[in-house]
């Protein structure tokens, strides 16, 4: 954290030395490599930033933090085609139509039950600084008992996850698929936005696959 603060204060040379020391202490710590690459990008050393990303990814293929930052660096270098090849949004971004569980009359009733459960959840917190939600509430884990209607949603999401992984399984050389886990665990949380509510730009570094389901919109 001190290293990041030094960078923000403009102490770039000291910050670079400190980053190198931090990486030397724990070469596997992805966040240190991302922050170092970010510093290099800020001071106009984009090629060095790319080198940091590529060297780490040789040892940790498919790491989401360095892969994501590598696309940013590539765009800064003007290599948009290579960046888009990694992102491959048309290939990896999929949509699924949520099916109505058997014990609900229709999908609207199911969504209403999910909304009601979320609004009454004891873990709802106002825009926690540890998360990306702003002007809204953010819940904790919704798959802990009592799950309520989220138990039915859990089964649906797991089936979609399995289908997604099977459909893309042949693309074994892409960084995203290199990081695909053998076993998958699902985590679900909810967000309730007010007027001007939004999410800060972010990724989920501990996750392989992320998705969103809008229960209710204005």
Language-model region placement:
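Non-heme Fe(II)/2-oxoglutarate
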Residues: 83-177
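Catalytic core of non-heme Fe(II) oxygenases with the double-stranded beta-helix
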Residues: 148-158, 162-218
